[in-house]
């Protein structure tokens, strides 16, 4: 304390000495700490850290309340700097992982590591196992028994999920005589087990977020085990395992798709557990929809019986181009500025004013050339199409098509340029530009497009070149690669991802008639699936695909279209 006497005053002023004066270094205690959580319930686990200051005179003092505390992985927990417990870290119970704890004062910094490990068992409250203690560590394990071991069938090995997915329904085949199951999620920092009496378990809410937050930095290994409560001596049968990861970047919230449940366009997304009908409010059938790149307009085919005609609406649900004006439509695409709408109908391309519906002419393709499935490039310079010379396509089917792009410049169309050649045994269709315009995703099949079980996803540079098969996305089920005839079609790129630390992946929705675990154990019903793409990869850029949680698995769902703008239709 310093005493100062002021001239002409009778009061003595006391000045408090700076407690950090002459501090030369900082230390954190304890160092390299670990928190192990065996119960995810409250109260939350805490760990008290101390900040120690070293001073020029050789002394060391506790300065915990005088420094700024931070942790570089806020998913693990936080320091309450506004409270009274300085240096007290409270675990979130919402993630396992590693972090760096830092303190700072007077330009000096100290760091230490913190590891949060989750080692817990959860009993399924909805379908509990028939008895307790069926998976005790002392019970013998048998791996790979062809009759008794269960088989994890969803998700597939190597699935990359977005961090905002609402839920994941893990599904497995039971194995003979088994009535109790244990699904284990394992990594360096996570040892989570769920015991259930069912052949499926849904991770949602807090547990879905826990898996996502933990797997962002390292893959999680998932394994299913099974036993029979009525058979002695007890044995635990171990099935296959899969690895899964979660990306840092997420696709937009909104995904529109057609559903046979309503014969209309549904509004959903990866963050939604269910979807609602967007349009129309009547029972009329609409489909083959597309959204303008700015999300302000939605075009679709409207069933006018016997014709299907163009109908467009704005984001508020107001009609722009009414179906009553009878402009035949199969597929459509907006110009990047949203001012023009190119419509394909039975192989003929016609351009319209998107705001008035006025005709702007027919695209000259040349003699015996037909085009369908148009998609306008983000820069407006080209329209990609499925181009055929064999026979005019219908709006439902195209044969022997090539992937081509048609130049466009201020109202003038150029000659179609072939990017991927087609033939009667090599059909290429549904080209779709990536958000940056560098790539085209498209579909390849060995025959006609309608109902093509051989349909698979492909990728090619937008200017042409060697095409890549999206082999994993198109042909992986569970642990098995190159599964044929999964009917993967209708690719749709998500707009630029929402990202936490920088965009790393592109997201591609598509339709596939593949099995979905034990819910849809056989192929044949089209559903919406999504794959993550690493566009920097020199090989197959795709990850194993995941099922869109908001759709109705009992009906056909197709034609996914992403949007960053919500349509409000009353």
Q: Which residues does each PLM region occupy?
A:
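Compositionally biased, low-complexity repeat tracts
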Residues: 4, 27, 49, 54, ...
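C-terminal motif of bacterial Sec signal peptides marking the signal peptidase cleavage site
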Residues: 6-8
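Extracytoplasmic soluble-region selector
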Residues: 10-127, 131-132, 177-180, 203, ...
């Amino acid at each position: 304390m310093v005493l100062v006497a002021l001239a002409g005053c009778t009061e003595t002023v006391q000045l408090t000495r700076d407690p950090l004066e002459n501090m030369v270094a900082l230390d954190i205690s304890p160092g390299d700490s670990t928190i192990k959580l065996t119960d995810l319930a409250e109260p939350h686990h805490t760990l008290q850290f101390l900040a120690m200051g070293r001073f020029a005179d050789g002394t060391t003092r506790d300065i915990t309340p005088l420094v700024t505390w931070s942790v570089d992985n806020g998913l693990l927990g936080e320091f309450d700097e506004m409270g009274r417990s300085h240096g007290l870290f409270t675990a979130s119970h919402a993630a396992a992982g590693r972090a760096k704890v830092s303190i700072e004062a007077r330009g000096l910094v100290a760091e230490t590591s913190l590891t949060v490990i989750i080692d817990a068992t959860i009993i399924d409250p909805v379908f509990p196992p028939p008895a307790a203690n069926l998976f005790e560590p002392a019970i013998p394990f048998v791996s790979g028994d062809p009759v008794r071991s269960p088989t994890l069938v969803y998700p597939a090995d190597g699935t990359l999920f977005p961090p905002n997915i609402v839920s994941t329904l893990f599904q497995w085949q039971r194995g003979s005589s088994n009535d109790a199951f244990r699904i284990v999620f394992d990594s360096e920092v996570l040892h989570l087990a769920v015991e259930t009496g069912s052949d499926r378990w849904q991770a949602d809410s807090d547990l879905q977020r826990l898996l996502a937050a933990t797997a962002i930095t390292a893959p999680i290994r998932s394994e299913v085990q099974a036993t029979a409560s009525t058979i002695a001596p007890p044995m635990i049968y171990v099935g296959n395992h899969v690895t899964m990861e979660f990306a840092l970047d997420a696709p937009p919230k909104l995904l529109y798709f057609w559903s046979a449940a309503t014969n209309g366009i549904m509004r959903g997304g990866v963050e939604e557990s269910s979807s609602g009908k967007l349009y129309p409010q009547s029972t009329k059938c609409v489909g083959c929809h597309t959204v303008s790149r700015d999300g302000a307009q939605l075009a679709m085919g409207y069933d006018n019986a016997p014709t299907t005609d163009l109908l467009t609406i704005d984001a508020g649900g107001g009609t722009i181009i009414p179906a009553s004006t009878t402009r035949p439509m199969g597929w459509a695409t907006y110009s990047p500025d949203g001012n023009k709408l190119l419509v394909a109908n039975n192989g003929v391309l016609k351009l319209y004013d998107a705001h008035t519906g006025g005709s702007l002419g027919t695209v000259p393709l040349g003699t015996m050339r037909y085009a369908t499935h148009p998609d306008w490039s983000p820069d407006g310079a080209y329209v990609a199409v499925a181009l055929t010379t064999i026979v005019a396509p219908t709006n439902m089917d195209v044969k022997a098509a090539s992937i081509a792009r048609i130049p466009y410049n201020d109202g003038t169309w150029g000659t179609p340029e072939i990017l991927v050649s087609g033939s009667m045994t090599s059909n290429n269709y549904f080209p779709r530009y990536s958000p940056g315009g560098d790539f085209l995703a498209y579909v390849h099949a060995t025959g006609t497009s309608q109902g093509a079980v051989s349909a698979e996803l492909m990728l090619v540079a937008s200017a042409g070149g060697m095409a890549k098969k999206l082999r994993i996305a198109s042909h992986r089920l569970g642990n098995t690669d190159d599964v044929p005839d999964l009917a993967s079609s209708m690719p749709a790129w998500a707009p630029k991802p929402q990202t936490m630390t920088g965009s790393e992946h592109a997201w591609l929705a598509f339709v596939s008639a593949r099995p979905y675990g034990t819910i849809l154990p056989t192929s044949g019903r089209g559903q919406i699936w999504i794959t993550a793409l690493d566009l920097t990869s020199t090989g197959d850029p795709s990850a194993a695909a995941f099922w869109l949680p908001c759709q109705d698995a009992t009906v056909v769902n197709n034609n996914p279209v992403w949007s960053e703008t919500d349509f409000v239709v009353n």
